[in-house]
Amino acid sequence: MSYWSVSDIRTHLRALGANPKHEHRVLRLWSQALPQTQGRRPLESFMPAAVREALPGIEAQLQALATLREQHPGEDGSARLLVGLQDGQSVESVLLPRDGLCVSTQVGCAVGCVFCMTGQGGLVRQVESAEIVAQVALARHRRPVKKVVFMGMGEPAHNLDNVLEAIDLLGTVGNIGHK
């Protein structure tokens, strides 16, 4: 199964017998870049067998949502990350000084602002909610991320449903405060 949205992940977990607490745990560990085996209690004590057995595959699918293709460090402590998506498209995320991350919400852009290179090729597609969260998880494998800004490739307001779903997850189980 390929995940695109956070809702897809929840639906798949429910189909395996997960309840909201199980979903919460899987999504929390993924969005915080922690292994699915981490936790105070052993999985056997509370996670349904079907979910436990599927976890390695689920974890692999979640990690495949966003992969690092290139990293370019900046002199100011920032780092540009070229992020590969499942379908072969790429977006950029930028690790910012002081625990921030700038994420992309579209592959390309339809606006075409004269100062921005992103719009020159036009809009290719929307970045799905799970792919937005995956950019955060990928960055957290490199260093702590406590703040997220939606100022990368694309116009967040033109992809509002996916952006809001990602914000909801990051602001709850993702341990990033809403401001």
Put a short name on every predicted segment:
Residues M1-D99:
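Flexible, acidic/Gly-rich N-terminal and inter-domain linker regions that tether
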Residues Q89-V91, L96, L101-V107, V111-K179:
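Conserved Radical SAM active-site core
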